[in-house]
């Protein structure tokens, strides 16, 4: 009977070992399947995450481009404002000078009158002094007369009102000036009205 008990114990052990092996194999199989599913899930998650990264990278690149364009636009705006401010400062006297030019023309015409008596001569001398002081004040602001007679005609500085043929002058030279022209710094306020040789 003891043999029989030993045999039963042995068979039970073998059965338990077989069950354990089957269970172990079953667990390994389940683990392998789970691992494969996990790998597939991780791959699809990785693909989704990569898509998201690519999408965010594209948005970042677009945003950086917009930011750089805005920054360049702002720098250009600042430069334009600075140039406008400098031009406004540089040419601030332009409207005043434009208003004074007709008075200068009248002074010049008045001083061309021939004085016959002492009273008229002294009046003309006083007008000439005022005229010179006015010119000096304008010169301090950067106003200067445009030279015309004997110079080559320049459409930016001269306005041709007549043409003549005169062998004493070169072709396209200014022969006579009817009204003086003026510049404020480098900007022509009023062109000279001139007669030009053909």
Curated annotation (Swiss-Prot):
This is Protein GrpE. The lineage of its organism: Bacteria, Bacillati, Bacillota, Bacilli, Bacillales. Belongs to the GrpE family. One of its GO terms (cellular component) is cytoplasm. InterPro entries: GrpE, GrpE_coiled_coil, GrpE_head. Pfam families: GrpE. Its main location: cytoplasm. The keyword Transit peptide does not apply. Homodimer. Participates actively in the response to hyperosmotic and heat shock by preventing the aggregation of stress-denatured proteins, in association with DnaK and GrpE. It is the nucleotide exchange factor for DnaK and may function as a thermosensor. Unfolded proteins bind initially to DnaJ; upon interaction with the DnaJ-bound protein, DnaK hydrolyzes its bound ATP, resulting in the formation of a stable complex. GrpE releases ADP from DnaK; ATP binding to DnaK triggers the release of the substrate protein, thus completing the reaction cycle. It comes from Bacillus cytotoxicus (strain DSM 22905 / CIP 110041 / 391-98 / NVH 391-98). NCBIfam families: PRK14140.1. SUPFAM superfamilies: Coiled-coil domain of nucleotide exchange factor GrpE, Head domain of nucleotide exchange factor GrpE. Keywords: Chaperone, Cytoplasm, Stress response. It is found in: Cytoplasm. CDD domains: GrpE. Coiled coil: none annotated. HAMAP family: GrpE. Residues 1-27 have a biased composition (Basic and acidic residues). One of its GO terms (biological process) is protein folding. Residues 29-39 have a biased composition (Acidic residues). It comes from the Bacteria. One of its GO terms (molecular function) is protein homodimerization activity. Residues 1-39 are annotated as: Disordered.
């Amino acid at each position: 009977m003891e043999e029989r008990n030993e045999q039963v114990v042995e068979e039970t052990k073998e059965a338990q070992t077989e069950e354990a092996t089957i269970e172990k194999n079953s667990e390994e199989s389940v683990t392998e399947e789970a691992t494969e599913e996990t790998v597939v899930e991780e791959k699809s998650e990785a693909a989704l995450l990569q898509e998201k990264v690519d999408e965010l990278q594209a948005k970042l690149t677009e945003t950086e481009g917009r930011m750089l364009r805005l920054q360049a636009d702002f720098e250009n705006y600042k430069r334009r404002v600075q140039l406008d401010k400098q031009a406004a400062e540089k040419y601030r006297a332009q409207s005043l000078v434009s208003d004074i030019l007709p008075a200068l023309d009248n002074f010049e015409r008045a001083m061309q009158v021939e004085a016959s008596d002492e009273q008229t001569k002294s009046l003309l001398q006083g007008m000439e002094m005022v005229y010179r002081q006015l010119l000096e004040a304008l010169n301090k602001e950067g106003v200067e007369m445009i030279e015309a007679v004997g110079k080559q005609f320049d459409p930016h500085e001269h306005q041709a009102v007549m043409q003549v043929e005169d062998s004493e002058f070169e072709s396209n030279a200014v022969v006579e000036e009817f009204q003086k022209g003026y510049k404020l710094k480098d900007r022509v306020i009023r062109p000279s009205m001139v007669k030009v040789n053909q």
